[in-house]
Amino acid sequence: GGNVLITAAGKVSYGKEVVQQFTPVFWNTSWFKMRPPHTTGILVNPKHPLFRQFPTEYHSNLQWWELLNRAQVMQFTHFPPAFQPTVQSIDTWFISRKIGMLFEANVLNGKVLMTSMDIISQPEKRIVARQMHKAILDYMNSDQFRPQFTVTPQQISELFTKTAGDIKSYTNDSPDELKPKIN
């Protein structure tokens, strides 16, 4: 019945195939044979209580560099359809999986907040990670920590055990919408 913080940086399996960097994919991953990065940015709700101590806009800015660049993402395709992660990575446009790096949920009689961002290593050298860690702990210890979504322990466990299939969705040709029209 308590609150649990799961720091899963480097330990996630389901989502491991998606490479995130701070800078978004250049133009189109299918043209570059799915070479990384695979994401086109992040989406966050800047009014969420977690971000009172980690100010942000609805997208990434420079304060996110340390947390996003080369961070692992989690894939949520096995979570409830309405589920929204607190920090949602935006997948490449033609695959559009639900992926993210931080979520909160009700689980059994307790509440969990899980992140795949590295918020704990070398806190003396990483002020951004240290501040995000503090913001998370303060949020979880407040009466504002009221997750909207419910997931099962198995759904969380599958983030560490499940693997996604390979995606080979690149082309040797131009996408149809960019081909010249020949009469």
Model segments located where?
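Short, Gly/Ser/Thr-enriched beta-strand-loop segments that form substrate-interacting elements
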Residues: 78-99
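A glycine-rich, often tryptophan-bearing local segment used as a flexible ligand/cofactor-contacting loop or short
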Residues: 2-69, 128, 132-138, 153-161, ...
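Short, surface-exposed beta-strand/loop micro-motifs that present aromatic residues
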Residues: 97-107
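A short acidic/glycine-rich loop-to-helix N-cap element
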Residues: 120-129
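Short, solvent-exposed loop/turn segments at secondary-structure junctions
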Residues: 4, 11-13, 107-112, 118-121
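Short, hydrophobic alpha-helical segments
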Residues: 136-147
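Hydrophobic targeting/anchoring helices
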Residues: 116, 146-147, 160-166, 170
